[in-house]
UniProtKB/Swiss-Prot annotation:
Belongs to the universal stress protein A family. Gene3D superfamilies: HUPs. Disulfide bonds: none annotated. This is Universal stress protein in QAH/OAS sulfhydrylase 3'region.
């Protein structure tokens, strides 16, 4: 039934539970599991050298989250995508581009401080997704 399952992952407890569900679904269906982690762009108004430092920290954090997702799901690096942008938009673009048959994500994320999913991001994905969305609490 499912050929490609997209896991939206932000490192929150909800996302960790979603990772377990996505992994199980991928195994049950013999599907490819793709992990997407979206991070917010650094505001331009920071200026040098603050912009460079903020970008470096944001990328380091994103790499850490990706590594955690890879460890939880067993997906190879080429199937663990880091995308810059608003989480919902990045997830939706990845789902379309990768022809996802199912999106799995937590119902809530880490919030704006972590520059990751909010409940509103989950709602946007559900409303605009090109495929079914499985929300995990």
């Amino acid at each position: 039934m499912f050929k490609t399952i997209l896991l939206a992952y932000d490192g929150s407890d909800h996302a960790k539970r979603a990772a377990a569900v996505a992994k199980a679904e991928a195994q049950a269906h013999g599907a490819r599991l793709l992990v997407v982690h979206a991070y917010e762009p650094v505001p331009d108004y920071l200026g040098e050298p603050f912009f460079e430092e903020a970008l470096k920290r944001r990328l380091e954090r994103a790499e850490k989250v990706r590594a955690e997702a890879m460890a939880l799901t067993g997906v190879p690096r080429e199937d663990a995508l880091l995308l810059q942008g608003r989480p919902a938009e990045a997830i939706l673009q990845a789902a379309i581009g990768e022809k996802a048959d199912l999106i799995v994500m937590g119902t809530r994320g880490l919030g704006a401080v972590g520059s990751l999913f909010l409940g509103s991001q989950s709602q946007k994905v559900v409303a605009e997704a090109p495929c079914p969305v499985l929300l995990v609490r």
